[in-house]
Design a protein with these regions (language model features):
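Short loop/turn motifs that connect adjacent beta-strands in outer-membrane beta-barrel proteins
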Residues: 53-82, 93-97, 131-144, 189-199, ...
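Exposed, low-structure sequence patches enriched in small/polar residues
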Residues: 382, 416-490, 495-502, 506, ...
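Outer-membrane beta-barrel transmembrane strands
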Residues: 50-79, 87-91, 114-122, 204, ...
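N-terminal periplasmic/intermembrane-space "pro-region" immediately following the signal or transit peptide
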Residues: 3-140, 371, 375, 404
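Solvent-exposed loop segments that connect transmembrane elements
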Residues: 102-109, 160-163, 249-256, 292-312, ...
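Outer-membrane beta-barrel channel domains
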Residues: 30-38, 63-75, 98-100, 104-258, ...
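Signature for the C-terminal beta-barrel architecture of outer-membrane proteins
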Residues: 195-198, 206-393, 452-454, 461-462, ...
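Extended hydrophobic secondary-structure segments that form protein cores and membrane-embedded regions
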Residues: 82-85, 142-151, 199-206, 282-287, ...
């Protein structure tokens, strides 16, 4: 059994009136008189009687206990962490909603009907993490991670066909689903050096984000991942293959046993302190093979192939080359990304033919910290297709993006999914106007208008418990020709509008056990938005979320 050294309390010299003779022995000759071997450093050491280090209780997460990995459950190096999370979400928004043929309101002649929407979402997560190794520094020898998730959601619209393709289902829906968001086993293969450089493999359902801001891929899905570091942790790398699982439509959880007919491969390399201290750069390669298939979502809507143009199954092979970075140069914080995608779509439905893909994306954020405040400016560009009928797809699309950029989930444009006929202009938690049916279940579309976004933002730590986020975005299409062809509507303007948002993050106990988020956002339409959605009324949304972690 391994031994550890623990400092013992020394006698109080004031209690002994006899003076000891001076110690003339050298340091090498002195025994370790103040240290004794301890066979079990986790349980044999009794905490002192004062309150700061009281002995743990199993039901209290603020005390030390073996259920959250403070003590090993077996031997000296096997730990168990149990975590429960309850997330509540409520949102009210004004969103253009297609009314369909069977409108719920008599006399509704416009294509877009009443847009008020109420969404409620309750999610319970239970996570088990069993691992062998040390609690810090050294990579774990092996790990088992299981996260089961139960979701119940409610959606209320003012129009039929919005919650289900069958108008007899009405204008509201309640649904529930149970799935696994993590079910993976990790094993360290070998060490590369005495500085904890290592190579490990993880197989199963796991979470993976391919860059700093999730511009291309961010998902929980089935995968085999080889990862590690070298050079004293100055270099980190990932090789990951994902035979994608199908998603449940309304909860967006994994279905576990249904193949998505899509293969994704990602390789990336990180270099810390590149050029200057505090700046990390990344090179990446993504491969997306979205195979030809037919699929209907849980609400009866066709999502593969998309119900637009010439409907035919088609296969997409796309290759992404990327360079990204995150860090700071002096006082200036910087995040940037640059991607080029190429490949082919053997039958694009808008073009009505095979197309060769060639599109680009660029993003840059600069910020400056002053005391408890941060001032930000950023820009985002995704190329658009200016000729939807030729044999080139020049509109940029991602695999599964979820960017926290320019306001992220607090902004109206990224928070709301704006629907059109059979497809969506933009999807929830994305700002790419891609004209695809569904970000998770639909196929990428590289014949799209693209986007130019300019942002100014402000963040403030108002108190140690309360954080404020404010953002203003100007949105503009790069090329509207694909929209004009798809909607059979000439003369669509490039200007979308101005998106402004406010967010509050409240942590009452200065930790992540309780997190309360509030967001309010609006979009003032310009000519392009009005041309598409037939309204110049300011759109709005607000949400409140609460996350409890035990």
């Amino acid at each position: 059994m391994p031994l550890s050294l623990f400092p013992q309390e020394t006698p109080d010299s004031t209690k002994n009136t006899i003076q000891a003779a001076p110690d003339t022995s050298t340091a090498a000759e002195k025994p370790l008189e103040h240290f004794v071997p301890v066979p079990d450093r986790w349980r044999s050491i009794v905490p002192p009687p004062y309150e700061l280090y009281v002995k743990g209780k199993g039901h209290n997460p603020y005390y030390q206990n073996p259920l959250k990995g403070d003590y090993p459950i077996w031997g000296q190096n096997t730990f168990l962490i149990l975590t429960g999370v309850l997330e509540s979400f409520m949102e009210f928004s004004q969103v253009p909603v297609p009314s369909g043929v069977s409108t719920s309101n008599p006399g509704s002649f416009k294509f877009f009907g009443e847009g008020e929407r109420l969404a409620l979402n309750e999610t319970g997560k239970f996570s088990l993490e069993l691992y062998h190794g040390q609690t810090a520094y050294r990579p774990r020898d092996w790990e088992l991670k299981v996260t089961a998730v139960f979701n119940i959601n409610y959606l209320n619209l003012r129009e039929n066909n919005g919650v289900n393709i069958n108008p007899r289902k009405g204008d509201n829906r309640t649904d529930q689903h149970l799935g696994f968001q993590e079910l993976a086993l990790e094993k360290k293969l070998f060490d590369l050096s005495t500085r904890y450089d290592f190579v490990s493999i993880r197989a199963g359902i796991q979470r993976f984000g391919s860059d700093f801001r999730a511009f291309i891929f961010n998902d929980n899905n089935l995968a085999v991942r080889l990862f590690g570091n070298f050079g004293g942790n100055k270099y980190q790398y990932n090789f990951i293959y994902l035979p994608m699982l199908e998603k449940e439509t309304n909860s967006e959880l994994n279905t576990v046993f249904h193949d998505r007919e899509q293969d994704v491969f990602i390789a990336n390399l990180y270099k810390h302190d590149f050029g200057v201290l505090g700046y990390t750069t990344q090179l990446s390669f993504h491969y997306n093979n979205d195979k030809a298939s037919t699929h209907y979502d849980e609400n009866g809507r066709p999502v593969r192939p998309a119900p637009i143009g010439l409907i035919r199954e088609h296969e997409i092979k796309a290759y992404y080359l990327g360079w990204a970075g995150d860090g700071h140069f002096g006082r200036i914080n910087i995040t940037h990304a640059l991607y080029h995608v190429f490949g082919d779509d053997d039958f694009n439905q808008i073009a009505g033919r095979k197309i060769d893909v060639s599109a680009q994306m660029a993003a840059l954020e600069l910020s400056l910290d002053k005391d408890w405040m941060r001032f930000k400016v950023s820009g985002f560009y995704a190329s658009g297709d200016n000729d939807p009928l030729d044999d080139r797809g020049q509109g940029f699309d991602a695999i599964i993006d979820q960017p926290f950029f320019a306001g992220g989930p607090f902004s109206y444009w990224q928070q709301q999914g704006l629907g059109l006929t059979g497809v969506a202009l933009v999807h929830k938690f994305s700002f790419l106007p891609t004209l695809r049916t569904n970000k998770l279940e639909g196929q990428p579309n590289f014949v799209n208008p693209g986007l130019l976004l300019l942002n100014a933002g402000y963040e403030a730590e108002l108190t140690p418990k309360l954080k404020l986020l404010m953002n203003v975005n100007h949105l503009r299409f790069v090329s509207t020709e694909s929209l004009e062809h798809f909607l059979n509507q000439p003369g669509i303007n490039n200007n979308i509008g101005v998106d402004y948002s406010l967010g509050l993050i409240f942590r009452p106990f200065l930790n992540n056990n309780i997190i309360c988020n509030f967001g309010a956002a609006g979009l003032t339409p310009f000519e392009g938005f009005e041309d598409i959605f037939e309204t110049n009324q300011t759109q709005f949304s607000s949400f409140l979320s609460l996350a409890l972690t035990y």
